[in-house]
Amino acid sequence: MNVDYINMIREDITKYIQSNTLRVGAKQSLAIMPEGDIPQDLQIEVQPQAQLDLLALHTGSRSVRFCVSQAEDSRVSLFLLALGGDEVAQSVRVNLLGAHAECSIFGFSAASLSQKYSSDIVVNHAAAACSSVQLFRQVVSDSADVSFEGRVMVAQDAQRTDAQQSCKTLLLSDSARVHTLPHLEIYADDVKCSHGATVGQLSAEVLFYLRSRGVSLLRARQLLLLGFADEVVQKIPAKALRESITTLIAKKIAANA
């Protein structure tokens, strides 16, 4: 299915919504980066063979909740980026109700000062042969607090499920806090599921290598952090949008590296 990703630009999402519900009809495609506020509670219905790419960029305090229902052979990609605001809370519930549905959720957050960001993700595999990905990268500095809770539920009838989950966090200060809780709940036999969460610091060995090549310590830290964020940013399908998001992240990192 082809999507004109040039149209994944800032746009008023309200014209696609009725009664807080965004519907993508059968075999339709929609790629959008909403302009302005997203409804705090948004129901998303994706019908058979439909495709949705939705990017939510948070540069101010915000609380959002997405509830996604996917029919057979549908594909959804959600991009959740938290780069500003004292407090950002993101909640996503995905129900894969039809066979061969695919859902990918990519998240990046950079928290500093006393900012508090949270991501609460649940993907429910209710049908056979569905796949899901949760890929989150977090950078935490100063006295910021970031949490990630990701849950994958696989029903008894959801055979041939493929579910992957990964959350990695870099701590840049001793006072920064992170809470991660990946969780798998599996009732089927024929599945391929993995989950993992790591918390660490910038590699001293790589920093030393870069400095030995004449790169300043500050620039070396910035390069490593940009590479870390790029694991998520490169999943964004529109090149122009990737570049603008990278610029925003670089500004955030420059202030906190």
Task: Give each language-model segment a name.
Residues 228-238:
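Short arginine-rich
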Residues 222, 237-246:
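Short glycine/proline-enriched turn or capping motifs at secondary-structure junctions
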Residues 115, 137, 224, 234-235:
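Short amphipathic alpha-helical leader/targeting segments
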Residues 4-208, 212-215, 242-257:
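Conserved beta-strand/loop scaffold segments within soluble protein domains that form the structured core
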Residues 209-214, 219-230:
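Extended amphipathic alpha-helical segments enriched in small hydrophobics
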